[in-house]
Amino acid sequence: MRGDRMSKAPRTAISPTREENYPEWYQQVIRAADLAENSPVRGCMVIKPWGYQLWENVQRALDDMFKATGHQNAYFPLFIPMSFLEKEAEHVEGFAKECAVVTHHRLEPDPDGGLRPAGKLEEPLIVRPTSETIIGATYAKWVQSYRDLPILINQWANVVRWEMRTRMFLRTAEFLWQEGHTVHATSEEAVEETEKMVEVYRDFAENWMAMPVIVGSKTPLERFPGAVETLSIEAMMQDRKALQAGTSHFLGQNFSKAQEIKFQSESGDIEFAWTTSWGVSTRLIGALIMTHSDDDGLVLPPRLAPTHVVIQPIYKDDSRAEVMEYVQSLRDELAAQTYANAPVRVTIDDRDIRGGEKKWYHVKRGVPIRLEVGPKDIAAGTVFCGIRNQPKSVGIDRAELVATIGEKLATLQQELFDAALKMREDNTVELTSEAEFRDFFADKGDTAITGGFAWCHYCDEDSLQPLLKELKVTIRCVPRSDNATEGTCFLTGKPAAQRAIFAKAY
């Protein structure tokens, strides 16, 4: 029957399923969606065109948000003199084990016909793991007076952190990101900036990625090295683990003192500036995959999808001209509609491959809406429509489809957010004892999905460390929206003034 054409499917397009082996399912979704692949360089990945279009959409949206909050883009060196990192002891300690170091500036032939390093550098150069130190040294030259402040700059760049256990998009030796670095005359202004930018990240995560997040403060042991305070957005993935999707750091005067960022105040005094930094990376794509995708492949929120609608013409040789004319006019009508204040992005897939193969190609890539049009549809004035999060496809009047395409995309965006929020709420608990804590986070097998988010009162972060390390759990954040009254520490039974979200994490 015509009504079954887009709904018949194998049991799942991705194997293994999430329940069978979540880590391997994640890797298979990336491959099936053609997002990225491993490179010849250990720990690095090749981001393929579909994945890079997705990253470009992330960039565009965030870049507009940064500029709307008064920030400008600039670019700073990839290489950082080792002496710059040594000026901020806590900072360098946090990154020392991950740094890639350049010690020579050329190659020369060796006697065996190969190449060897030559021209040893006077001072080793670090391939940036983050840019606070090199940017701070530049700001020290730019800032002389309070009139030079604030400085509000963002950089789109690549960074290197020599990870030993890598996973595409989540943890790679080289990754793409943005890092904002700002300088202020007062502590109050810098704190306001820190809070403003974590709110930008929350807005983007929830309204563009359709990914609900918890905004909170990191505890002292979890803060960014050298920061006075770190704010983060934390999301729950479908395996109930947490993923830190973005951070915003109030650096106090720590980096300005190390880098000599000083200015003359209105009163004529020489003062150290107050700085912030904040960033997100291609890790967001990993978060998006694990928040929404299913056992048939990638599921994309429409606001970030490279293509909103794909049209698959179905014809035999004698009907090709008629079908293609109809499909092209349908594409033009749909592209003239708007969704989220931008034109609907529509493509036609006229490749000479089997219809079923073509359908699953787009399902696995997460295209939000798939349309099929053949001679019978033209005669009836209808289009066969499949929406990515719906199990069945249906026929719909062409005029109705065109008139409601923006609404359908908006509905899908909201449904993805609602499903992710429900999943988080269904897997969030409050625990009051060590026994409950151990049971909640206990491993139930190599591939079993267990745990979730646990609200717990606690009184001393240091005393929790042996238990947390044993269970591979971390304190994700102290949520800023939490209005809980004083409670009892789940570990010691002593009075505790605050509570936090605990979870296993990426």
Curated annotation (Swiss-Prot):
This is Proline--tRNA ligase. It catalyses: tRNA(Pro) + L-proline + ATP = L-prolyl-tRNA(Pro) + AMP + diphosphate. Belongs to the class-II aminoacyl-tRNA synthetase family. ProS type 3 subfamily. SUPFAM superfamilies: C-terminal domain of ProRS, Class II aaRS ABD-related, Class II aaRS and biotin synthetases. Keywords: Aminoacyl-tRNA synthetase, ATP-binding, Cytoplasm, Ligase, Nucleotide-binding, Protein biosynthesis. Homodimer. It is found in: Cytoplasm. One of its GO terms (molecular function) is ATP binding. CDD domains: ProRS_core_arch_euk. Consists of three domains: the N-terminal catalytic domain, the anticodon-binding domain and the C-terminal extension. GO terms for biological process: prolyl-tRNA aminoacylation. It comes from Rhodopirellula baltica (strain DSM 10527 / NCIMB 13988 / SH1). It is an enzyme of class 6 (ligase). Its EC number is 6.1.1.15. GO terms for cellular component: aminoacyl-tRNA synthetase multienzyme complex; cytoplasm. Catalyzes the attachment of proline to tRNA(Pro) in a two-step reaction: proline is first activated by ATP to form Pro-AMP and then transferred to the acceptor end of tRNA(Pro).
